Amino acid sequence: MVITLVGEKLAKPGLEFIYYGPGEPCKTCRLARVCIGNLEPGRRYKVIKVRNIEHPCPLHEGKVRVVEVVEPAIEVLMEPRYAIAGSKLTLRFVDCNDPEKLDLVRPEGLFEGDTVKIIEILGDVECNGRKFKLVKVMREKE
């Protein structure tokens, strides 16, 4: 669990967001260490709790709220031979060029080379005449 700040409109339990990096106003903000210092660019986060503390912010339409976030489980396609529930492995993206499946081939929030734990096998997906497994994974932090 990570404590951070998000715009008031995003401060809702269950809401997910991708952190893309600091905005220009963040570079001189006194709250930057708490707000963006705990987040990793390119990662997906899920708000699990909203605290009753708010601060002014020029980037987020006036106000940010203190929230608790976690990295959620993410769905990704995987080679069937590696798709074993409970196993940990180094993530390798599959070769699938179907634009409709891009969010499952290279989901935002995961990077090739991440260590992940397979939480659940969700089913089979075909792409380019090959069968892959759709799995739900959690990133394992080093």
From Swiss-Prot:
Domain of life: Archaea
InterPro entries, sorted: UPF0179
Homology family: Belongs to the UPF0179 family.
Matches recorded under HAMAP family: UPF0179 (MF_00498)
Protein name as annotated: UPF0179 protein PYRAB06360
High-level lineage: Archaea, Methanobacteriati, Methanobacteriota, Thermococci, Thermococcales
